[in-house]
């Protein structure tokens, strides 16, 4: 059902070998975490043991980080819901599990900013949440209006929220109409000047095929995309 920590051996018969191959080719791997359903609280000893053991087993394979994809909010409950949201509580737990695994490698955590849900601001930024990893603004659409919101979200979060490593699902994630090359170009231009440049991998949105691979677009569009991608890396210190 797409949850849990078991490896799909039909598609990955040798996960350790796959991880090694990726690293040999300069690719870092971030696993997306969707765990089972439960009504237990986040500090329940059995739940802590379950997540710690399973996350650690995958880290031993060489995984470079975790995408904490809101799932703890749907499966566990914060014991301090009035002051610490489920999103932030999950960030704390996942971060501690990563940190306890190794002190010589900087593993990283991608997590949802708890003040915004699916690109829409819901509350003031969390004081606690700003401490943890790379954050993103949730499952957003690909339309121009959402791109406009993301520019505002990025400025507000990186300044008022004091969380410098913010990111968006570049190109959008859901409910898209047929996507134009011009619209995808605008997303890349925005992303190139954002703290984190991350194109979302969804290839079909709202029943319409939507290719996110830059090299599949026209030669003219590729030239523009390459220009902005190169600009980003030229600006990096």
Language-model region placement:
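Catalytic-domain carbohydrate-binding cleft regions of carbohydrate-active enzymes
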Residues: 1-237
């Amino acid at each position: 059902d797409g949850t849990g920590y078991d490896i799909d051996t039909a598609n990955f018969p040798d996960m350790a070998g796959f991880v090694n191959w990726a690293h040999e080719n300069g690719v870092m791997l971030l696993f997306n975490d969707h765990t089972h359903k439960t009504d237990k609280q986040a500090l329940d000893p059995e739940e802590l043991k379950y997540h710690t053991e399973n996350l650690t087993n995958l880290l031993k394979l060489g995984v470079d980080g975790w995408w904490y994809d809101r799932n703890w909010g749907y499966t566990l409950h914060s014991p301090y819901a009035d002051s610490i949201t489920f999103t932030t509580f999950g960030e704390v737990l996942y971060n501690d599990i990563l940190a306890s695994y190794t002190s010589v490698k900087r593993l990283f955590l991608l997590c949802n900013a708890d003040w915004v849900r699916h690109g829409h601001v819901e509350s003031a930024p969390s004081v606690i949440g700003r401490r943890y990893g790379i954050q993103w603004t949730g499952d957003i659409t690909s339309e121009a209006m959402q791109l406009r919101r993301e520019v505002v979200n990025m400025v507000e979060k990186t300044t008022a929220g004091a969380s410098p490593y913010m990111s968006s699902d570049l190109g959008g994630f859901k409910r898209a109409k047929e996507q134009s090359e011009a619209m995808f170009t605008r997303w890349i231009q925005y992303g190139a000047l954002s703290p984190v440049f991350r194109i979302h991998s969804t290839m079909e949105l709202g029943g319409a095929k939507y290719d996110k691979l830059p090299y599949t677009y026209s030669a003219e569009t590729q030239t523009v995309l390459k220009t902005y991608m190169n600009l980003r890396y030229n600006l990096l210190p």
